[in-house]
Regions:
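Membrane metalloprotein/metal-transporter helix-bundle signature
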Residues: 2-190
């Protein structure tokens, strides 16, 4: 039994190919590369889902306005990067967004909708700029549309998660916020 398991493990190791975090736009197309891009970065996933959870905590118009502000400003940041406009501290700002959004969820901060939209919009500017800087061989319009679709889907998942866990009590969403902070800290120290 052990010999068979060892042989299988060795065979699987030899047959394994390198992992690629993002789809090649030349093989899969720019739209699919854009859609897949935010789905393979823990920082992006944590931030996008946290936006949705925070919007669900605020409720009302924030359910759509806060995620919409993020997507809109992310498109602006992407456009700036494609146009060659540099933003300072892009990666630290993305990391700050993960931790900051996690703290907002953990503390269940209730700002007015416009202020909440401004907060996420500022963070989104840096996320969009990072995506524009990672464009590579992809066509800008298709890639941008793809990552905006994926971002909106992650926001939707966050809103659904936030609304769903509300039934279990407000502490559950706050724990998810704390988990986001821990995830952001883990990324910072990795």
């Amino acid at each position: 039994m052990l010999k068979r398991l060892s042989f299988t493990a060795a065979l699987m190791t030899l047959a394994a190919s390198p992992a690629f975090a993002h789809l090649d736009p030349e093989t899969h197309g720019s739209l699919m590369a854009g859609i897949s891009h935010p789905l393979f970065g823990a920082d992006h996933i944590l931030a996008m889902v946290a936006v949705g959870i925070w919007a669900s905590q605020i409720g009302g118009r924030a359910l759509w306005a806060v995620p919409a502000a993020f997507v809109t400003m992310m498109a602006v940041g992407f456009g700036l990067a494609v146009a060659g406009v540099e933003l300072p501290f892009v990666e630290p700002a993305i990391l700050a967004s993960v931790i900051g959004l996690g703290l907002l969820v953990a503390a269940a901060v209730r700002l007015p909708v416009a202020a909440s939209a401004a907060v996420v919009g500022l963070f989104a500017l840096f996320h969009g700029h990072a995506h524009g800087g990672e464009l590579g061989a992809a066509g800008a319009l298709q890639f941008g549309l793809g990552f905006l679709i994926a971002t909106a889907a992650l926001h939707g998942a966050g809103v659904a998660l936030g609304l769903g866990v509300t039934r279990l009590g407000p502490a559950v969403a706050r724990i998810l916020g704390l988990a986001t902070v821990v995830g952001g800290a883990a990324i910072a120290f990795s």
